[in-house]
Amino acid sequence: MAPKGWPLLLESLGWSDPELWWSHWQQRGGFELARRVWPADVKDQWLLGVALPLLSQAESLLQMGGRPLLGLSALPGCGKTTLCDWLVHASSELGWSIAFLSIDDFYWPGPELDRRMAGNPWGVPRAIPGSHDLELMATALDQWRETGELLAPRFDKSLRDGRGDRSEWVRSTPDLVVLEGWFVGVLVSDQASEAENIHSLALTTEELVYRQQLFRLVPDYAPIWNRIDKLWHLKGQSGTSSRLWKRQQVETQAKTTGVHVSESAVQDFVRMIETAFPAAWLQDLHQSDVVIDLTNQRAVREITLK
């Protein structure tokens, strides 16, 4: 069953008749398109309500030309990396050239990253504002748009005992780039800050002080967000959805790769996600074009357009 708002999304992508849209994708493989990328238990509703419409968005942007940048924002553990990986493989099968970048690829090199993350109250080695080389990110995106060549670093989170480091540089010539991250599109909102229930978070003095430092860094990301042509937001049921999703992600990672993350590290990371920003900053992205509301089980509840 298609989620609420799905027909309007298709219409915004140039498909007024959902049956014609479905026929279009059935001829290209439908749910079997790049199926190998998905976990065995992927739901058809996810493919119908999220994956194939996102592929349609990419197709629409490619038809417009100009080397478009498609943004994808979602809390950690939501499945956005797998979604982007599928998008690249599906596009390749269709003969399109699409690449995806995470803002995490632009973390500072190890020693500089350690310096910038020192003293944060959650003890996280990365992920928060200030951990990214924004000048490098802007340069990589701008040079790609000007020349067609994308040169970007990759970050391996398993290096340096889990603190991570740059591992390689990748050169490609995509016609479209997807930029994903857990706070892509987040902007400072005084109104949301005022509405926040500080007491319910039980913020420590250290957290209160440090998050003000983060708030001052958030505007530095706006020039990157402004480069995005279309922004999709996979919105969790609440600001605490990542608590469940991250644990599931860590469990899956341990089973598939043998890499284990300590319980304390998971707790620190989740605490950071829940307290680094007011929840409304993550839940209500003013620049988003498509919002897909998800349950804690990652089922699509509703799709809205902005």
Regions picked out by a protein language model, each given a short descriptive name:
Residues 1-70:
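Extreme N-terminal, non-catalytic leader segments
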Residues 38-42, 99-102, 106-160:
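Conserved nucleotide-sensing/catalytic segment adjacent to the nucleotide-binding pocket
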Residues 83, 87:
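Hydrophobic positions on the alpha1 helix immediately C-terminal to the Walker A/P-loop
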Residues 89-99:
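Post-Walker A helix-loop "phosphate-sensing" segment adjacent to the P-loop in P-loop NTPases
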Residues 74:
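The Walker A (P-loop) glycine that initiates the GxxxxGKT/S ATP-binding motif of P-loop NTPases
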Residues 80:
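Conserved lysine of the Walker
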Residues 77:
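Walker A (P-loop) phosphate-binding loop of P-loop NTPases
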Residues 2-29, 183-306:
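Conserved NTP phosphate-binding and transfer environment spanning the P-loop NTPase/kinase superfamily
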